Amino acid sequence: MSSAPAPGPAPASLTLWDEEDFQGRRCRLLSDCANVCERGGLPRVRSVKVENGVWVAFEYPDFQGQQFILEKGDYPRWSAWSGSSSHNSNQLLSFRPVLCANHNDSRVTLFEGDNFQGCKFDLVDDYPSLPSMGWASKDVGSLKVSSGAWVAYQYPGYRGYQYVLERDRHSGEFCTYGELGTQAHTGQLQSIRRVQH
């Protein structure tokens, strides 16, 4: 007797509301949305429920501005997704699922200089403080994601700006800190963790 193949992960899905605490008009997303105002008809997003998958939300349309990682769960107001970010955003206007969010198979290499030059560190685990693990600089010049998906933070303790790093975007290669996102004005990365799947 043969057994049926194990089912794959459920498709990514999340529901958005235009008011806090899951009130007001709502819109459900199953794929990338460059502008929730146009596609979903919501004037703003004030609460989010992630049913499946992991998502990255952006404060502006077209995947621009501050990034916020949204893992499975409820986000009843902006403080739930901003957390201890140095930049609080009370609006989210574009969304996309995170690719390759396999927590068990994640590898990233940090480089001191641009274009994968200088000292390097290979990581396969979460690090709440890169300086305490021996990374001599507060900055990371470039990085390569070999597998999985990661979220890097500006400060130790998973605080500050968030940068979502995926193997299947940019081929996993970020040659300069400017490729981390439109809000990346510095290469300061001091903590990093694997994305929860």
Swiss-Prot record:
SUPFAM superfamilies referenced in this protein's UniProt entry, alphabetically: gamma-Crystallin-like (SSF49695)
Protein name, entry field: Beta-crystallin A2
Query: What residue stretches are annotated with the Beta/gamma crystallin 'Greek key' domain?
Result: 12-52, 53-99, 106-147, 148-196
Subunit structure, as described in the record: Homo/heterodimer, or complexes of higher-order. The structure of beta-crystallin oligomers seems to be stabilized through interactions between the N-terminal arms.
Q: Where is this region: Connecting peptide?
A: 100-105
From the UniProt entry, list the residue stretches annotated as the region N-terminal arm: 1-11
Disease annotation reads: Cataract 42: An opacification of the crystalline lens of the eye that frequently results in visual impairment or blindness. Opacities vary in morphology, are often confined to a portion of the lens, and may be static or progressive. In general, the more posteriorly located and dense an opacity, the greater the impact on visual function.
Which Gene Ontology BP annotations are present? lens development in camera-type eye; visual perception
